[in-house]
């Protein structure tokens, strides 16, 4: 209807300090659909008078940051580029390609000195993830991040000064699959020494995919035909982060836990339902918990599960995140608590954000464009870290 108000479509903009180059993006988050990844489609606005004959390039970089700068003293750099792509934007060197809806609207708005660019993500890169530092840690967190950078130069071999460049942090993200798998279910039996019959444990979930902030219901059934007594039952959500760089390291962190002190004596059965809620709010003091990548000082959440394209090598560099429910029975021993043992089983599941409705058609909407500057006023410590890194880039 003509009387309806148009929705607002935020366009993100950032300009170099010499005012010669500005980058415009229609969004900051790019979705990895497992089989394909949304490309970065943007526009660069140049001022030919200020460029004075310089060429303009745009790069896409995926970097793994170690987070702790003092690691450099042992001869290792604390940043490794996992992927780097560069294209010349001005003067144009390629035949113009079909424009996306966002590019069409931006170029119509910005005029003749606007030039489009498209940069593709390869399908082997991890998503934006970071490991939570301890409260006392300083500097950038260990993790994977993505950056768009535009700069002007006479020669690619020359040092790139920060006044001639503009950097924009973006994210590569994934959403929950549209077709989840079967309901997770696991069972185990344990035969104790000097006990004729086993202890049987069954655990199940109502579904495979859970959304951030959604309680996870775990159904547990214990059939104790052994001569032992089950003293305690616990259910936990474990986050498993596989950090792959020069070696493969695993970090297993409990992010939610519930216990029942209900005893299950010999020859008895017991059924119980646990409700677990894995939230970052309950885990802010824990170091090395994986978090979804964030932009500047925005808040984030526990990292989403990593979905990989079939056939992808799980040793791809970066951080891969999985989740599992672990159900544990603590069983009495011959000498009481001193010799108690544990019986456990695990249920892998997926923790992600739902795919937002209408997200696929965002670029086709005829809405009002609103320009928003990429923030130059983050928290003081983060601004100092960014400026320090830019100075280091200048020195390379």
Curated annotation (Swiss-Prot):
Pfam families: Arrestin_C, Arrestin_N
Biased composition (Basic and acidic residues): 375-386
Family matches, as SMART domains: Arrestin_C (SM01017)
Entry GO terms, CC: membrane; photoreceptor inner segment; photoreceptor outer segment
One of the GO BP terms on file: G protein-coupled receptor internalization
Compartments where located: Cell projection, Cilium, Photoreceptor outer segment; Membrane
Top-rank lineage group of the source organism: Eukaryota
Residue span of region Disordered: 375-396
GO MF: G protein-coupled receptor binding
Major site of localization recorded for this protein: other
Biased composition (Acidic residues): 387-396
Listed Gene3D superfamilies: 2.60.40.640, 2.60.40.840
Function: Binds to photoactivated, phosphorylated RHO and terminates RHO signaling via G-proteins by competing with G-proteins for the same binding site on RHO. May play a role in preventing light-dependent degeneration of retinal photoreceptor cells.
Similarity-based family: Belongs to the arrestin family.
Complex formation: Interacts with RHO (via the phosphorylated C-terminus).
Protein name per its UniProtKB record: S-arrestin
Gene source species: Xenopus laevis (African clawed frog)
